[in-house]
């Protein structure tokens, strides 16, 4: 019974911390607001991303499938050669932009830069770390051992592995931190012709997103271009937004926020709880080992059980 009691104590600690440890961002954390309602699917963001991150084009698969030569780039999804990807939603005759029925729309896939990243928690060698100031999830190739735990842990299937390389690395978007270090912004935001990809501080982007979902469909709104700090705008007709900001709560929140006129599940985005898997697992660990009470109690129970077993066998 005492052995069971020790086990129950441990289980009790696990239950009490299962809600997890919630993490917050610094006031200077940066991110991207992607507004699918004003995206035209031109893929200028993809081309710019490849150019400024030295990523090679992917054309072999499409050329092989279509028999057409000379296609510069057409990746199917995120890969070790593609850090962001515009995907198309279609329904019925796809005649109306931003319509769930018989319509079409676009969504952009890239690293979400989670507030509490599962990939960072899963990495055993801290090859993936979250920058304390910017919040960007950064990769250290020199620390990486190629275990690929981050790939399994990520709920968005973002990190990719260079299987074809002799010395492979993990590949993912880092919000063009090399450009930011020189005073620039992510290439996908700088070269987006409509403002669909918008750079800024996460707090400001959230404020902008909340403003947009309250807009009246059919009205005109001056959409900021490239970066919130620039002040450049482009007037456009407002689409019927879904009253939801994807990334505000998912998995504890993300620095990559999305708006759309189409339900996000139909765009291939996962439904996640408001708590990250990382916070749950770390909360359990911290709860169990806090003060070493549970391990000591468990050890005491096991020793008592062993003593009783030995005593009974000798008797």
Enumerate the language-model features and the residues they cover.
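Non-ligating segments of multi-cofactor redox enzymes
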Residues: 1-315
């Amino acid at each position: 019974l005492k052995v069971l009691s020790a086990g129950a104590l441990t289980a009790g600690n696990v239950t009490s911390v299962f809600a997890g440890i919630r993490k917050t961002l610094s006031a200077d954390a940066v991110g991207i607001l992607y507004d699918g309602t004003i995206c035209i699917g031109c893929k200028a963001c993809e081309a710019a991303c490849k150019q400024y991150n030295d990523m090679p084009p992917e054309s072999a698969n499409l050329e092989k499938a279509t028999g057409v030569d000379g296609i510069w780039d057409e990746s199917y999804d995120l890969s070790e050669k593609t850090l962001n990807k515009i995907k198309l939603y279609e329904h019925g005759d796809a005649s109306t932009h931003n319509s769930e029925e018989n319509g079409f729309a676009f969504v952009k896939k890239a690293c979400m830069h989670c507030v509490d990243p599962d990939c960072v928690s899963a990495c055993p060698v801290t090859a993936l770390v979250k920058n304390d100031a910017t919040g960007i999830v950064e990769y250290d190739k020199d620390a990486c051992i190629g275990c690929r735990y981050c790939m399994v842990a990520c709920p968005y299937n973002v990190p990719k592995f260079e299987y074809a390389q002799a010395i492979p690395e993990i590949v993912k978007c880092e919000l063009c931190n090399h450009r930011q270090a020189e005073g620039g912004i992510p290439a996908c935001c700088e070269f987006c012709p409509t403002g669909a990809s918008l750079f800024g501080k996460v707090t400001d982007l959230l404020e902008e997103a909340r403003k947009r979902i309250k807009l009246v469909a059919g009205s005109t709104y001056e959409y900021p271009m490239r970066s919130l700090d620039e002040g450049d705008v482009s007037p456009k007709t407002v689409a019927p937004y879904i009253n939801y900001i994807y990334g505000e709560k998912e998995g504890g929140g993300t620095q990559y926020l999305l708006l759309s006129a189409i339900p996000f599940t139909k765009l291939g985005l996962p439904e996640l709880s408001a708590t990250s898997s990382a916070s749950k697992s770390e909360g359990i660990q911290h709860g169990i080992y806090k003060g070493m009470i549970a391990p000591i109690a468990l050890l005491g129970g096991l020793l008592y059980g062993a003593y009783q077993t030995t005593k009974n066998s000798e008797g």
